[in-house]
Curated annotation (Swiss-Prot):
Gene Ontology biological process terms in this record: translation
The name this protein goes by in its record: Small ribosomal subunit protein bS16
SUPFAM superfamilies recorded: Ribosomal protein S16
GO terms under cellular component: cytoplasm; small ribosomal subunit
Swiss-Prot/TrEMBL keywords: Ribonucleoprotein, Ribosomal protein
Biased composition (Basic and acidic residues): 103-115
Superkingdom assignment: Bacteria
Family: Belongs to the bacterial ribosomal protein bS16 family.
InterPro entries per the UniProt record, alphabetical: Ribosomal_bS16, Ribosomal_bS16_CS, Ribosomal_bS16_dom_sf
Gene Ontology MF: a single term: structural constituent of ribosome
Classification of source organism: Bacteria, Bacillati, Cyanobacteriota, Cyanophyceae, Synechococcales
Entry keyword Ribonucleoprotein: yes
Cited Gene3D superfamilies: 3.30.1320.10
Length: 125
């Protein structure tokens, strides 16, 4: 299976990436079948060989998640929402709701506790 992935190069902490087509079992920085583009995350510079990318995609090449997002931004493929992403977003939303409910409960309990403390201190005077 042919994968479209990012091949890292550059200095330490100054990485740049080449968008390459390679065999799915090859190493990340191994020899690619074809170089299809360039991406620099620091400057957000992206260069894509659109004709070659369309050819590879029509042949059945599978892009990785990072490459898929670059291709979506470049307008080569439509933005897709996969079922796993939908489920993950639902779980995240539920987690946020439960966390906010817990925070509200803690605040109300703290305020009730401080009211009781202030009442006991005023009645003791």
């Amino acid at each position: 299976m042919i994968k479209l992935r990012l091949k890292r190069y550059g200095k330490k902490r100054e990485a740049s990436f080449r968008l390459v087509a390679c065999n799915s079992t090859s190493r990340r920085d191994g020899r690619p079948l074809e170089e299809l583009g360039f991406y620099n995350p620091r400057t957000k510079e992206t260069r894509l060989d659109t004709e070659a990318l369309r050819t590879r995609l029509s042949q059945g090449a599978q892009p990785t998640d990072a490459v898929r997002s670059l291709l979506e931004k470049g307008g080569l493929i439509e933005k897709t929402i996969r079922p796993a992403e939908i489920e993950g977003k639902k779980k995240q939303a539920l987690a946020r709701q439960s966390a906010s409910k817990k925070a509200v409960k803690e605040k109300t309990e703290e305020s009730k506790g401080s009211e009781v403390d202030s009442e006991t201190s005023t009645s003791a005077d």
